[in-house]
Amino acid sequence: MNRMVNSRVLGLMATLILGLGAANDTHAGVVDFEDLTPNTSYTGPGGGKYWNGSDGKGGFVTNGATFANSYDNTYGSWSGWSYSNTSDTVTDGYTNQFSAYTGIDHTADPGKNYAVYSEPWSPAPTLTLAPHMVVQGAWITNTTYAALSMKNGDGFAKKFGGATGNEADWFLLSISGTNSLGQSNTVDFYLADYRFGDNASDYIVNTWSWVDLTALGDAQELTFDLSSSDVGQWGMNTPALFALDDLVFSEAPEPTTLVTVGIGLLLGTAVFRRRNRIARAS
């Protein structure tokens, strides 16, 4: 009889433990910035609005992710993250800092938001994920400001490839993070690359490109670093900006109450069987 009871209880335990896997199945989420409302109108071609931190909030939170921003009231400058839906692909220079070179967000839906990053003087973690969020990747492209600067040159930065087109220029985004085991990893993505032997292969990214970030594991703080072959006395000459949209993450929920109860029953069964063995031995 005891063996029959034990078998039935253990069968129930097996079912509950198998349920643990289902309870912990990951599901995908997307940080798409659509719950945010840009507050400053852009007066250039295409119109649209942007937010650059001038309200002094120091950043924004959306879909469980925190994006840091620093705004300097003295100079009206900013660094870290902003968000925008401007669509100017033709105006060069710093007045057009908030437009993706695609002229539209990743979903190709006019008026939708995306994020724009401007590198601080000292790169530091600027994107923090909520607990249990594991980054999978994001869609990334150039800003119009950076792309036209590399394509044509300007008063501060060179034309990529130089006059002949043979100079091996590049513009690199490095995304790094440290996982829960203390392991640091970096993912590199070239926003422009003119290092090819055949100049026809040289490129400046002008579409939304998927960047796989699974190598970063469960890192909760991400650091973004921009570097370029065009460096002068005061550092990098290439405008230190890029655009990001639809950051994809997986999220593992906490164990459910059912699983917790199941574990308790399993322990209770073990105690029950031990007492039976002791009773039979007496």
Model regions and ranges:
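C-terminal membrane-anchoring or membrane-association module
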Residues: 270-282
